[in-house]
């Protein structure tokens, strides 16, 4: 069995999303000690910003106008899609950046859509865990309720468009204890961290059995 893991944090060494994904992966590996893990880290190895446009434009160009840059982009799109489609289970670690989806993760989505768009849902029925973290609080009743424009979008793409069997693991207030203005939330943040760890353990166990 093969687990595909994608990380997107721009701070890999201190990433809260990667730490939770580590917990999910550990539970999966405990159940599948002989399983393989395919990894891609978009934070440390981002997709070139022009890759999607090059791959897409190549569809509309005559053969004599297709350059090596177009071919490289097409090959990368095929490689990314093949990684995903070879997976028996998927683990995505995607933090919230500036209230939305980070550009490097959006580029990955666009490249997958380029290759699989006409071939049916990319993750139909595949057990998938989405780990997402947010530095502040965005829940009901908070001053920034509704400012998280990432999670609804990702849920729409993964569960509705790609038809993944999706489980969501979330953690908020990750900047409490880092930003002085959030010190009053440190106790709540610690509680949310504990809950997120427990949710990640449960998600990992479930991922291993589905």
Please describe what each predicted stretch is.
Residues 35-37, 128, 166:
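Hydrophobic anchor at the start of a short beta-strand
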Residues 48-54, 142-143, 179-182:
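Short aromatic-enriched loop/helix-cap "lid" or pocket-rim segments at secondary-structure transitions
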Residues 144-145, 154-210:
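Glycine-rich phosphate/pyrophosphate-binding loop and the adjoining helix
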Residues 5, 92, 128-132, 168:
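Structural beta-sheet core signal
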Residues 1-94, 99-114, 198-210:
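N-terminal beta1-alpha1-beta2 submodule of the flavodoxin-like/Rossmannoid cofactor-binding fold
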Residues 9-11, 135-138, 174-176:
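A short, flexible beta-alpha/helix-coil linker loop
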Residues 42, 133, 171-173:
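Active-site donor-binding loop signature of nucleotide-sugar glycosyltransferases
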Residues 118-163:
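Short, glycine-/small-residue-rich phosphate/pyrophosphate-handling segment
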């Amino acid at each position: 069995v093969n687990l595909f893991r994608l990380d997107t944090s721009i701070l890999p060494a201190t990433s809260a999303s990667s730490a939770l994904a580590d917990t999910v992966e550990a539970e999966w590996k405990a159940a599948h000690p002989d399983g393989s893990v395919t990894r891609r880290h978009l934070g440390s190895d981002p997709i070139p910003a022009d890759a999607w446009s090059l791959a897409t434009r190549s569809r509309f160009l005559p053969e004599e106008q297709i350059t090596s840059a177009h071919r490289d982009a097409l090959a990368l799109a095929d490689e990314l899609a093949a990684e995903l489609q070879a997976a028996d289970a998927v683990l995505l670690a995607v933090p919230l950046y500036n209230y939305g989806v980070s550009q490097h993760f959006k580029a990955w989505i666009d490249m997958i859509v380029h290759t699989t768009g006409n071939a049916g849902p990319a993750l139909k029925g595949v057990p998938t865990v989405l780990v997402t973290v947010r530095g502040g609080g965005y829940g009901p009743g908070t001053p920034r309720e509704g400012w998280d424009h990432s999670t609804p979008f990702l849920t729409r793409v993964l569960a509705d468009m790609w038809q993944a069997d999706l489980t969501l693991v979330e953690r908020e207030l990750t900047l409490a204890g880092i930003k002085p203005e959030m010190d009053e939330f440190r106790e709540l943040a610690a509680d949310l961290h504990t809950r997120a760890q427990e949710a990640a353990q449960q998600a990992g166990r479930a991922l291993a059995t589905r």
